[in-house]
Amino acid sequence: MIVTFEKTYLQKLYVDGKTKDKKHRFQPQIVSKYVKVVNLMKQQENVLGLTKFGSLHYEKLHGDKEGKSSVRVNDQYRIEFIEGMEAGKQIATICNITDLSNHYK
């Protein structure tokens, strides 16, 4: 699937492994797991491929986050993203990663 980043700090974390923004600093273990999960997302044909990895806990979100989906980075953090279909390719999914959030805040 094609993965895009809505916020620049998410792309910087993926590419560089760090960000200069003090608000979005994460522990090195979180960043490495984030990169690993994004790479796994890129390897899948579509979001249904994420369901075969139980540890990711793929789910569609409800309530105020209606329309978004998420996969777990670890017990505390998750990647929130919006799913979309690419014109011409029905099996390819474009995931726009919107946030790396603390699941319990």
Residue ranges of predicted features:
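Short secondary-structure junctions and interdomain/linker hinges
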Residues: 17-20, 44-48
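Conserved phosphate-interacting/catalytic interface
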Residues: 41
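Arg/Lys-rich, positively charged N-terminal/basic patches that mediate binding to nucleic acids
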Residues: 1-38
